[in-house]
Amino acid sequence: MCSIGEDDFGDEGGVHAMKEESPLPEGATTIEQEICRKCNDQRAVLKLNQKEPQCRECFLHYVRHKFRASLGATKIVRRGSKVMVVFNGAPENVVMLDMVRHGLEQEAFKKLRVDPVVVFVGEDFIGRDQEGYEQSVREKVQILRQFGFPAYYTVLGAQDSCSIEDNCLAGKFIGDQDKVTKVLQGIKSITSKQDFIVQTRKQTYKAIAKKLECGYIFLSSIGLELAKTLLSDVSLGRGKSLALDIAFCDDRDEERKIIRPMRDLNPEEIEYYLKFAENQLQSVAIVDPYLDKSSLQNLTSKFVDGLQLSFPSTVSTVFRTGDKLGAEKIPTCDNQLEDDDHFATLFDKSLKLESNAEEPRKCKFCHSALDYRDSTTLFATEFSRMVSSRINVQLSHEEIIESTKLMEQDACKLVNAELEDDEMRQLKRELCHACRNILVDFDGK
């Protein structure tokens, strides 16, 4: 139980209660002529923040134990399960693949008992020319081959995959790439573009996992990334799905669960794992094509990074707070994209909607629980938007009162998706607030 009273928190929240520390050097501190405090035998090679000096073997054991402990403590992943491991070539992603390989090579008692299938989901066609895209694919495939796992290749938005040994991988999914590119070109704001990519990415993972008959999807998200995701979800209006977006297990789809076994690791541990691992591991930095643009996600990311420099416990505090949040369970069969549906159908008006009297319970796009009905928060947002567009100084007092009554009615109808024509009304009924914003922001032809 927290011992800090509510009165201790003013307008600045709990920031004033956090001890500000001078910026620490990046990574752990390499030390000399010290003995490892774990084994008391080998020479220490590093000292992580607030940790004792460690030798190379003890450090690798410590990091790998955190990975295995997250899987063992929850007992969600069953023995012998076929697991789809998502690959993108990032440092934390390469570390996860090496940990999986190391676990499979252990003796019977310590062996990681899963059947991994690696899937490389290409996204580099966004914001790059064909030559740059092909070069990026070749580079990442070369990194992937160092692990020796059975591996497949696909792209963002696709629903099928091919072996990485096939020729001309970058040219196999031109149609799927064009669909994603067309939608992104039609979305006006960078915030909605980035949100669309995140939601489509999850949809792609689940579609490929179903094709490969995998019940679990391993992602390499670490604590820093998940802390940023938590705050970004708040700013985007995805509070209903926030808990599952950062949880160890996202079980919105009970047949294909998303697992985040790297969530307890931090960037320093990733950096030094790559340095001290038995095998020389190659990785690449993931380049976000919209990183230098203005968006809610980019602003949140910079805010967290900046606060972390002065208050090193920021990420841990935000991340662990998210662990205390709950999420509503919705049956998988309710209102999600069917096998023959595709994300693009939401934007090209070809999605088939079933008109029925039942209230939808799950978002058609992101599959989070719907909670917009009679929402006072959304009502205030829509009403404020209407006041800005409809009220002007030339209106009389009586006209303002009459207009206010109409705006209240219209705002309520907008929140409950009752104001538009039949087709748009039915579509908005089946989307959460954040996914509605993506659709509203889309003006593609």
UniProtKB/Swiss-Prot annotation:
The keyword NADP does not apply. One of its GO terms (biological process) is tRNA thio-modification. GO terms for molecular function: nucleotidyltransferase activity; sulfurtransferase activity; tRNA binding. SUPFAM superfamilies: Adenine nucleotide alpha hydrolases-like. Residues 1-26 are annotated as: Disordered. PANTHER family: CYTOPLASMIC TRNA 2-THIOLATION PROTEIN 2. This is Cytoplasmic tRNA 2-thiolation protein 2.
